[in-house]
C-alpha cells in the first residue's frame, strides 16, 4: 500500500518520531509480546502501595468549603490523605465536577444540582480531531485479511496461539496500518485561510504542522457491519487536523450515570469545511491512480462525486470523533476566563484537587494524543513526588 502512495507522489517518512511527521509510514505501535503494554507498564509487577477499586465509577467529589476531601461512588465514599487527582478524561472529568456543584450555574440549576461554585469554563473549549472513512472492494490478490476474518477456525486457532505466547495473526492484524500526515498545497492562498488570525496562519504554515492525516487498512466493519467478513477491501480514514471550531460538553441529567451531551461543533467554520473537502478529495484522487485502481472492484463507502457539495455531504453523513478530546478543563494562567487549572494541574479556587488527563491540555496536538496523555500523567506524578517528598 505504501508503494501505491509513493507512486502517486506522496512522500514517505522513515521516522514519524523525528519531530517531522510529514509523509507516509507504517504506524508506530505501543505493543510488546502481542500485548498493548504501555498502559499497564506501571502495574507490572504489582506495586505494593496501590489499590485499584473496580466497578466503582466516581459520581461526585466530597467538598467542604473550598477543600476537596475525597470522592463518592454509588454507595461508598473515599477520603484522600493528601489530594484527589481526577483523571477521568475530557468527557467524564467535567461531568464529575458538574455533579459536584462545580461548573456553569445555569446548567446545574436546570437539573437541581446545588451550586458550590459557578465556573462557566467547565466543559467548554472542547477540541477534537474529526475523520471520515472511505472504503473500496478489492480483488482477492490485494489483501490476505479476509482469509483470516472470514474463517472462524483460523481465528479460533490464532486466539489460542496468542493466549499461549502473544504471537500470531491476532497480534498483528489490528496494528498493521499505514499512517501519514500531509499539507494541502496552496492552502494559504484561499480566502478561508486568509480570514484566520495571523497567529493561526503562522502556525499552519510551519513545515511540521499537517493539515490532515490518512490511515490505511482500517477495519471496515466498524462502520459497515453488514459487509461480509470474506470481502476483500481497503478502508482509509481521513482525519482533519487543526480545526478552528470549538465545542462543549453540557449536562443533560442530574443522574451522574448519564453522559454529558457532546457537541464538538465539527465543520462549523468555513475554513474547516474547506480543508475537510480538499483533504478528502486528495485521498480519493489517490484511489483513482492506476496503481490502486487496477485492483478495485467497486466502492463500499465513498462520496457520490468529487464535487465540493458531495464531499461536504459525505463528511456530514459519516463524520466521527477520533476520541482525541482536549481542553474541557483547560490549563491557563490565573485570570484567564477560559482556564480552570493552573500549571501545577491544580484546580483553581479549591484546595486538594488536581486534574491529570487530556481535559487540561489547552491545545490539540497535531498527532494522536496517547503520548500526550501519558506525559500529562507523568508530569502530575513528578509534581506530587516533589511536593510531598514521596521518594
Predicted feature locations:
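Structural core of flavin- and non-heme-iron oxidoreductases
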Residues: 1-391
Amino acid at each position: 500500500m505504501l508503494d501505491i502512495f509513493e507512486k502517486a507522489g506522496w512522500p514517505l517518512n522513515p521516522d514519524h518520531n523525528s519531530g517531522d511527521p510529514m509523509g507516509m509510514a507504517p504506524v508506530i505501535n505501543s505493543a510488546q509480546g502481542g500485548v498493548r503494554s504501555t498502559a499497564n507498564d506501571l502495574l507490572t509487577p504489582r506495586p505494593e502501595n496501590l489499590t485499584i477499586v473496580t466497578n466503582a465509577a466516581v459520581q461526585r467529589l466530597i467538598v467542604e468549603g473550598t477543600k476537596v476531601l475525597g470522592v463518592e461512588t454509588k454507595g461508598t465514599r473515599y477520603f484522600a490523605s493528601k489530594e484527589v487527582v481526577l483523571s477521568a478524561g475530557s468527557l467524564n472529568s467535567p461531568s464529575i465536577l458538574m455533579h459536584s456543584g462545580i461548573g456553569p450555574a445555569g446548567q446545574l440549576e436546570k437539573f437541581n444540582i446545588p451550586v458550590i461554585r459557578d465556573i462557566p469554563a467547565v466543559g467548554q473549549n472542547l477540541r477534537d480531531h474529526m475523520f471520515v472513512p472511505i472504503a473500496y472492494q478489492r480483488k482477492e490478490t490485494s489483501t490476505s485479511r479476509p482469509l483470516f476474518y472470514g474463517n472462524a477456525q483460523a481465528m479460533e486457532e490464532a486466539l489460542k496461539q496468542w493466549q499461549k505466547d502473544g504471537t500470531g495473526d491476532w497480534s498483528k492484524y489490528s496494528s498493521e496500518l499505514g499512517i501519514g500526515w500531509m499539507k494541502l498545497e496552496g492552502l494559504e492562498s484561499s480566502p478561508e485561510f486568509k480570514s484566520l488570525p495571523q497567529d493561526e496562519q503562522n502556525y499552519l504554515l510551519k513545515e511540521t504542522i499537517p493539515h490532515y492525516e490518512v490511515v490505511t487498512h482500517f477495519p471496515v466493519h466498524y462502520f459497515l457491519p453488514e459487509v461480509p467478513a470474506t470481502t476483500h477491501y481497503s478502508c482509509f480514514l481521513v482525519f482533519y487536523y487543526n480545526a478552528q471550531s470549538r465545542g462543549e460538553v453540557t449536562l443533560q441529567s442530574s443522574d451522574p450515570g448519564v453522559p454529558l451531551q457532546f457537541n464538538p461543533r465539527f465543520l462549523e467554520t468555513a475554513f474547516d469545511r474547506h480543508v475537510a473537502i480538499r483533504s478528502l478529495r486528495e485521498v480519493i484522487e489517490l484511489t483513482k491512480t492506476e496503481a490502486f485502481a487496477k485492483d478495485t472492484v467497486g466502492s463500499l463507502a465513498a462520496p457520490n462525486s468529487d464535487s465540493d457539495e458531495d464531499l461536504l455531504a459525505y463528511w456530514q453523513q459519516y463524520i466521527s470523533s477520533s476520541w482525541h478530546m482536549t481542553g474541557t478543563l483547560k490549563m491557563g494562567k490565573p485570570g484567564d476566563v477560559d482556564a480552570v487549572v493552573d500549571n501545577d494541574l491544580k484546580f483553581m479556587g479549591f484546595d486538594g484537587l488536581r486534574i491529570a488527563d487530556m481535559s487540561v491540555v489547552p491545545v490539540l496536538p497535531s498527532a494522536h494524543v496517547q503520548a500526550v496523555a501519558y506525559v500529562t500523567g507523568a508530569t502530575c506524578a513528578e509534581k506530587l513526588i516533589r511536593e510531598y517528598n514521596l521518594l
